[in-house]
């Protein structure tokens, strides 16, 4: 799996959670693993059925920490998403003046360079569920 400034994201069409995690762990150290879906009406946007504006993961957490006089110190070099349950919600990508949109289905994955490529979401999340892994890159 090769991410570069010219190709800051990779789409994987057919995989399973086990193989996905094994490949992602080769890229670095996980700093957080979570489930993204529509679980409520309050809190983080990643757990609500709502559009999400283009962003780099960690921006919201850093802003919320700063509001409380705290710091957010997790490194999120790579964002890895595995689709546990598909849906109609569109994942939007934006990098270096380019854009792409993908509707993830079960067994598909996205690996995104979180320093180059912003992402967002539009459309109804419904019961779509993603496994999200934040990765701090291995020293190169």
Locate each region found by the language model.
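Active-site environment of non-heme Fe oxygenases that use a 2-His-1-carboxylate facial triad
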Residues: 1-21, 33-140
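Active-site donor-binding segments of glycosyltransferases and PAPS-dependent sulfotransferases
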Residues: 27
């Amino acid at each position: 799996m090769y991410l570069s400034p010219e190709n800051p994201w990779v789409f994987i069409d057919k995989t399973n959670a086990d193989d996905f995690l094994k490949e992602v762990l080769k890229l670095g150290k996980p700093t957080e693993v979570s489930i993204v879906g529509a679980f409520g009406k309050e809190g983080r946007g990643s757990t609500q059925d709502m559009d999400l504006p283009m962003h780099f993961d960690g921006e919201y957490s850093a802003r919320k920490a700063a509001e409380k006089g705290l710091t957010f110190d997790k490194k999120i070099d790579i964002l890895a998403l595995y689709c546990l349950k598909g849906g109609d919600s569109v994942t939007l990508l934006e990098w270096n003046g380019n854009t792409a949109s993908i509707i993830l289905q079960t067994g598909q994955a996205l690996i995104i360079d979180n320093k180059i490529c912003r992402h967002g979401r539009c459309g109804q999340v419904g019961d779509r569920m993603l496994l999200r892994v934040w990765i701090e890159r291995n020293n190169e």
